[in-house]
Amino acid sequence: MNMQNFHYHFLKTNNELTLIADDLRSIFDSTLEKVISLTEEVETDIVVRHSPINSIPELGSSGQYTKDARCIDVYLDLDSPHLKSNFETEIARTLIHEYMHVVREQYVPWENGTLLDSLIAEGLTQSFEIEVQPTLPPSIYA
């Protein structure tokens, strides 16, 4: 697989991600390999930052996609006990979920979507999470 279409950016303002950057790259590479085998490859920037305020407290992580820039933002709370004990699972789950939004956006652009549109989009991403990780339930925080 050609991983040149995925650009990882680890924000280093306070060096919080320095010690885990290689682990994150490894998780991203293995997760994207599975994802691409089930869908298509869309050039995407993946930006990771330590941001407790943007993380879901129960997970220690969260993510979002930026449709026009084909960018995924991954927010981590590196002090979260849940994230520390479920690091690979939560990172992979976030990437799978947000990447599916990026792929969907290529075919069904989001413009002034309704609540129904949001429910459908989140349902599709959760179904994809199950397809990629069949032994794990999808996140309840879609």
Residues of each region from the PLM?
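Auxiliary, metal-adjacent structural segments of Zn-dependent hydrolase domains
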Residues: 9-70
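Cation-handling catalytic/transport regions enriched in His/Asp/Glu
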Residues: 45, 50, 88, 113, ...
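Short pre-active-site segment immediately N-terminal to the catalytic Zn-binding motif
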Residues: 77-94
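Active-site recognition of the HExxH zinc-binding catalytic motif
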Residues: 93-106
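Hydrophobic, aromatic-lined core segments that form the binding pocket/scaffold
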Residues: 68, 75-76, 103, 132
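Post-HExxH zinc-binding segment in Zn-dependent metallohydrolases
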Residues: 115-142
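Membrane-interface helix caps and helix-loop-helix hairpins in membrane proteins
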Residues: 108-111
